[in-house]
Amino acid sequence: MNKTLYTSKFSLGKWCFLFIGGIILFTIAYAFATIPELYIGNNWISGTLSLICGVLLLLMYRWLVRSYEERKIEELSMQKSLKDTGIGFLWGMLMMAAVIGIFALCGWYKIIGCSFNVAFVYRYLMAYFVVAVGEEIVFRGIMFRLLDSQFNLWVALIISAIVFGAAHIINPNATVVSTVGISLATGVLFGLLFKYYRT
């Protein structure tokens, strides 16, 4: 059994099955996982169902890799995940604080009111958990990783970044500039981070 993040090259048929089938499977599952946030009014119920859906997506990915790639799932190692998640949260908060700070200095961001609702925060924290899990499985866990293992890093970065950006063109108020920005800043960056940290 190959115990690395990347398996040796598959046969073309098996690679196509994992690549196309995996993307289709998790895109559909991800769509269903967003239902609680979109259609359930109660914040606590919606948040809890979103959390359950996110965990199920992770279990599905574990099943896919174990069943068809027959390797240790290094990218979902709990020992690495807890530490890396904490570091990721810290960097994420620092970057968001920097962006908001720049916006405020430029006069583009103003606080006109302040309130705090624990249930509301819980709901959307869990909703974004589903978004993060779903997108990372599809674009990094499957698309980027399989392209990188079968071809090379540049092919994986370019294709996954373009598709990642294109998937966000349907966002409210999205523009060509914002889509290109997501492709370059997020698609490429997250691909490189996945390659470096292997998680």
Language model: regions and residue ranges:
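Residue-level signature of transmembrane alpha-helical entry/exit and packing/kink sites
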Residues: 10-22, 42-54, 84, 88, ...
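Small-polar-interrupted transmembrane alpha-helices in polytopic inner-membrane proteins
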Residues: 97, 132, 152-169, 183-187
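Juxtamembrane helix-loop-helix connectors linking adjacent transmembrane helices
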Residues: 35-48, 70-138, 144-149
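Membrane-interface helix/loop boundary segments of multi-pass membrane proteins
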Residues: 134-159, 192-199
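Functionally important transmembrane alpha-helices
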Residues: 179-199
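N-terminal, membrane-interfacial amphipathic/helix-forming hydrophobic leader that caps
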Residues: 1-72
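Aromatic-anchored segments of alpha-helical transmembrane domains
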Residues: 23-31, 96-102, 161-170
